[in-house]
């Protein structure tokens, strides 16, 4: 990878351009007037969207796809034997990680960066929705498609650039951040950082480098520790806290989750209330973080909260895909025990008298090994039935003994869980145990969403 980002990038070629993050960045370059080409192993809606904007996208990887590109952009999931990557090295082309390419764009604007182990995509979507509702025209890049906008990124005319900042490999430290939002510092990505202390250190550095304002959770223990360290290291830094804690600058209370989420916020002795369009107690907290950031930027509080409340969700975040014979099928990106608990808690608020059936795809061998017990305890506590698929390894090589069975075998009540590696068999099993009124939800940030059509087909075959 190129260590120094060039001043000019010229024509860009994106390897693995079909993913949500890469396609969003490619779109920004296209809308900023750059020539973009790319490749991916499979055709997708993201590929079609980029082609519609003028990008030449090839399906499959081949050295010829690089063409006359001046810069190669790659993702962390790239294998080093990729022919396009090898050709770029032979030609001496700059090879940028996607975070470096994004930094080249965003460091030219006033940057709002959203970081944290969970809640980044939703919080970013709320901030963008709020800014648009307040009349601003920000540029943005999000980890998921904002449903009301039909895109995960856009080049706007305003001074602000809102970005979901990736902490997984430390790349969020590349950005010249003006305003930072830290949703939480729950332990994750320890395969990269090596220890919880190093993970926390990265967030402290991220906060210290934020020039204007840091907005941080008052409820999360890791975030509290970052706040304490930040105030000691940079006593003049402007910090706003949000959450349910009594000492939070923006305090959330009176949360009602029976139906649409309603809650109240206290801010500078004033009280504001809102009702969201997305379910789940955690989204009241996410909205409070977005509110703290917008009011910290100087926007009027009541108007800010009203604009945030118009947020209608993002793809792959508690997304309904269909209902068959009274059985609803949802998909969610949750891939950490805390996220799984939040998604299933939200499901409980809408399922009524029905049961929750979780179809869980563990993500990464390292995460599965580290958190198998926590995944099992969370799934068993919040779901009535669970189907565990095999591990989606992404960038990692398989580890001996680390499969989905590692999670399933830790259930205290084995009759409530089934480890099924074959997707069709898993879909059929789910359809057979489901009954009218049940809530089926797929969980994971790999490719588990691809099982949803099989689930719906199996339900039609078994239930109708």
Curated annotation (Swiss-Prot):
EC primary class: ligase
Domain of life: Bacteria
Keyword Cell cycle part of the UniProt annotation: yes
Claim: RNA-binding is one of the keywords in the record: no
Localization terms from the record: Cytoplasm
GO-annotated cellular components: cytoplasm
Gene: murC
Native species: Leifsonia xyli subsp. xyli (strain CTCB07)
Function: Cell wall formation.
Record family assignment: Belongs to the MurCDEF family.
Protein name: UDP-N-acetylmuramate--L-alanine ligase
Annotated binding of ATP, by residue: 116-122
Keywords: ATP-binding, Cell cycle, Cell division, Cell shape, Cell wall biogenesis/degradation, Cytoplasm, Ligase, Nucleotide-binding, Peptidoglycan synthesis
Pathway: Cell wall biogenesis; peptidoglycan biosynthesis
Record EC number: 6.3.2.8
């Amino acid at each position: 990878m190129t260590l120094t980002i060039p001043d000019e990038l010229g024509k860009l070629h994106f390897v693995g351009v079909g993913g949500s993050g890469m396609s969003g960045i490619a779109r920004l370059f296209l809308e900023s007037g750059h020539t973009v080409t790319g490749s991916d192993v499979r055709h997708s809606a993201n590929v079609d969207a980029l082609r519609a904007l003028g990008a030449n996208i090839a399906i499959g990887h081949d050295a010829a796809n690089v063409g006359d590109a001046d810069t190669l952009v790659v993702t962390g999931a790239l294998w080093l034997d990729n022919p396009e990557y090898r050709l770029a090295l032979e030609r001496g082309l700059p090879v940028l990680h996607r975070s470096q390419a994004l930094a080249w764009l965003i460091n030219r604007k006033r940057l709002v960066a959203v970081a944290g182990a969970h809640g980044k995509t939703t919080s970013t979507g709320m901030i963008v929705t709020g800014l648009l509702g307040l009349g601003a025209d920000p540029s943005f890049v999000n980890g998921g498609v904002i449903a009301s906008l039909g895109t995960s990124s856009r080049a706007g005319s305003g001074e602000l650039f809102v970005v979901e900042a990736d902490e997984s490999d430390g790349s969020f430290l590349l950005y010249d951040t003006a305003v930072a939002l830290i949703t939480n510092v729950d332990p994750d990505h320890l395969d990269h950082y090596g220890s919880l202390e190093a993970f926390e250190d990265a967030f402290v550095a991220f906060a210290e480098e934020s020039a204007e304002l840091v907005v941080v959770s008052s409820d999360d223990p890791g975030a509290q520790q970052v706040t304490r360290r930040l105030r000691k290291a940079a006593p003049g830094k402007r910090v706003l806290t949000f959450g349910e804690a009594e000492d939070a600058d923006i305090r959330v209370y009176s949360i009602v989750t029976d139906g649409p989420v309603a809650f109240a916020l206290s801010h500078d002795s004033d009280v504001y209330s809102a009702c969201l369009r997305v379910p789940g107690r955690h989204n009241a907290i996410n909205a409070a973080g977005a509110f703290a950031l917008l009011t910290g930027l100087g926007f009027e509080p009541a108007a800010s909260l009203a604009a945030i409340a118009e947020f209608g969700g993002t793809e792959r975040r508690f997304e309904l895909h269909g209902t068959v014979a009274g059985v609803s099928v949802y998909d969610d990106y949750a891939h950490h025990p805390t996220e799984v608990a939040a998604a299933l808690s939200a499901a409980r608020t809408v399922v009524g008298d029905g049961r929750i059936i979780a179809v869980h795809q563990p993500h990464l061998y390292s995460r599965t090994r580290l958190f198998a017990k926590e995944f099992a305890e969370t799934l068993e506590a919040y779901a009535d039935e669970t189907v565990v698929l095999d591990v989606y390894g992404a960038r990692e090589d398989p580890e001996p003994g680390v499969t989905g069975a590692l999670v399933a075998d830790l259930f205290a009540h084995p009759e409530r869980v089934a480890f099924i590696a074959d997707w069709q068999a898993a879909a059929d099993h789910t359809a057979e145990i489901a009954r009218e009124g049940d809530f089926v939800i797929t969980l994971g940030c790999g490719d588990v969403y691809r099982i949803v059509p099989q689930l719906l087909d199996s339900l039609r075959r078994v239930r109708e």
